[in-house]
Amino acid sequence: MKFTFSTLGYVLLMAMAFPVFAAPSNDETYKKLEAFSKVLGYIEDHYIEKVSTTQLIDDALRGITSSLDPHTTYLPPDLYKQMKVDTSGEFGGVGIELGYNQEKELVVIAPTEDGPAIKQGVLPGDRILSIDGKSTANWSLMETVKKVRGARGTTVRMMLQHKDDPKAFEVILKREIMHIQSVEYKLLNDGIGYIQVKSFQEKTDQEVERAFAKLQAQASKSDGKLQGLILDLRNDPGGLLDQAVAVADLFLDDGVIVSTRGRDNLLQGEAKAQVQGTLPYVPMITIINEGTASAAEIVAGALQDLGRSPLLGTPSFGKGSVQNIIDLEDGSALKITIARYFTPKGRPIQNVGNQPDIYVSSITPVLDEIDMVREKDLQGRIETIEESGLQKTKDKTGKTEPLKVVDIQLKTAQEYLKSSSFFQNKEAKRQ
């Protein structure tokens, strides 16, 4: 690793070596614990119906954490297992992204390129009617994921229906090791590179580094060199703190990337940029929006405060807290908020977010104005926000057609990179 932590450590998904539960501090605490034990026993012995003691305890643990901030929670074994899969970027599956259509039916959002599903003719929008002979009606996404994923080499049987074809068809898919790509990239016009970071999982820094190298190679074949870079952090929910630091460090050669403060606002640690491994300098701009959260906000804040990249878009989500995952013996875990993080200039992100240097609103074509929920709006949960539908336009024949969406934020970032004197001045200072 080319970044250093003073005392920060791996604070998102690595267990820390301190006791999970402190010893009761007084007699009152002992009495409350005794009361809890008695209530549990009475329910087991006398409740009108048989109940699962394990489920009762799980519910009680969730109840304890529900009175704290929204990011402190108890994770039962199945949820914790899923979280580890999401951050590792590898799992046994069939290569489909799941979701719901407007009728709230389970559908395939997109099949993965070269995955088992696409090879069997599975298409975007296909309804998932049943899995291994069981109807998927009223299934949650979590239930569906658990059924679809499994050990490499095993099979899953799915009954599907194409979007515009009433005839159902069955596929038997053999599970393979699937890799979740957290980074996408492409070379835009005028030699400008584009890198999108979808989340911060294991090896995201390596993916960004590879993307940058490939953009350089592509640019050298056309205009000679990479003229600029757009880093897209929109709708990036965050992820691993150490990966956020590593990605920021790719573009920085000096300065504090992030610092954390715990209970009583005491400094816990800080991560500093290092010269070694820093990517070659090119003018750069970073796009953020209301969905840019947590680890993504660390990267955006560091690039902005240290003068490496201006931010373009709308204010970010505002999740400026750090969570630690503590493994429990039964395979479950406690996710607990242990600190707040601050940008290089000491700015708190919690409930505030990063403010863009260049404000450019998104023009998502929906009929109703949507107020995006940010961290400051959270209490016990985040309510689901549903779009009411796309606006429609009419062609010359009078028929309606979907409104074409222009990514005005990306387009503005391109124009800014091509014309702004800001980057010319920065380049002159580096000479």
Question: Model features per residue range: what roles?
Answer:
Residues 10-14:
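Hydrophobic helical h-region of N-terminal Sec-dependent signal peptides
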Residues 24-34, 38, 45-46, 52, ...:
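Glycine-biased strand-turn-strand hairpin within the trypsin-fold
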